[in-house]
Amino acid sequence: MQNIITMQVLSATSEKGFSLDELVFRTKELFEKEGLASFVGLILELVDERICLKMVQGKIQDGSHACCLSPEYAHHDLTDRQFRTSVGKVIIRWRRLKCTGCGKTVIPLRQFLDLELYQSKSSELEKLVTEVVSEQSYRRSSSHMELIGSIPVAKSTAHRWVAQSDCDKLDSSDETLDLLFADGTGYKRRPDDDRDINNRGELRVALGVDKSGSIAPLGAFSGKSWKEIACAVNGRTDTDEPVADMLISDGERGLEQNLSVLCGDHQRCHWHLVRDLNYTMWQDTAGKLERKETQKELAAIIGIEIPEEDFEQVCDDDKDALEDAVAGAERDIRKLIGKLLDKGYQTAAEYLIRASKNMFGYARRWLKTGIVTPRVSSMIERMMRELARRLKRMAFGWSEDGAAKMARIIIKRFTSAGQWEKYWRERLRIQNNVMLVLRNIKAENPQTLGQ
């Protein structure tokens, strides 16, 4: 269906001069308030007229919604409808046809556009609102959209749209991941005295890295234990294979105990390892200077670097030297644990004993497979900083479900943009079925105005 649409705009400018800003402002005002929405509405009415005419003439049949064996349609009435979109409020009068045989009525344009029964907004507006509120609070988002984009959406309406959307759903795969990261951060949730729930909420996130190096978000959870999270992560696959080859964590006990069994190996984050030793020695009443010296000693022991060359180019002697360095580092760790025990630092010693089991998984994996594994959990830490920057500022008093949903939206947008855009391409049905071409913009001779 092709149509040539003519748009007439009357422009009147002062001969004494005007500012460029006023011209741009008035142009934007005209098209945002009237032009664009009216343009969309006109195209819809033209399509509606064409479809209904062909159905009444019997040239096309409503096969997917046929009411009887040989339906014949006649015009029944017109219904006013309006849709909220990013270009403004689109107002149309669509036709309702009635079958002369059985009396059933249909709205061809609604079926043609595949709209829901009581749909009052476009999906592209929902996408815009969701992306804006993932950056700032609902109140600020509402003001921002009206001020910058002239899109009035109340904060309660935006909240309802996001809560009802399934855009936070994450893709699943049976492929074994290369790496698994997990971490948590606190936020002030909505308290509930009846259920004995305080305002100290915790948001926990699991991320994976696949064999190609792409980040795969696995989920965001609030009010869930690490055991429940492990069950959810493990349930994403239907196979008995490990979820990931290597877990990289900060050593939190619940996380380590429940997620390490889902992976082939476990690597403790070296940065957290050194930092947390200071805290455990403080619990043992060690002095500040001694704590700092012990931290430096631990950092020197575990600072074993992987050769920069490709695995195939590293000679056997260098590989043997790396293996000997790991064995020597493990002996030094045992000596350090003995020193801590001799000084009565029981908490710090137990901390290193537990951590020593997974200190050098990255080196052993490289020696076995040639795959380089990070020694720190900086990737998940960066993601948690982004989440904390948003949620701790705007999620005050949120429910646990609301905070988890927004976290899934954020990690999907920022760690797997491909998933996010794929979802919305399918949802918006962008399939090159509409083409608009601006042929020309020209002015009429002023002498013909008013004729």
Predicted segments with their positions:
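Acidic/histidine-rich catalytic cores and adjacent linkers
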Residues: 2-45, 49, 60-61, 67, ...
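RNase H-like nuclease fold core
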Residues: 2-16, 73-78, 89-90, 94-118, ...
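Short, flexible, mixed-charge glycine/proline-rich loop motifs
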Residues: 52-64, 71-75, 87-93
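Short cysteine-rich clusters marking metal-coordination/redox-active sites
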Residues: 65-68, 99-100
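Catalytic or ion-translocation cores adjacent to nucleophile or general acid/base/metal-coordination motifs
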Residues: 119-123, 223, 270-271, 275-282
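Short basic-aromatic helix/loop recognition motifs at nucleic-acid
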Residues: 129-135, 374-375, 379
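Short, charged amphipathic recognition helices of the HTH superfamily
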Residues: 133-145, 332-333
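Short, surface-exposed amphipathic charged segments that create phosphate/polyanion-binding patches used
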Residues: 194-199, 280-291
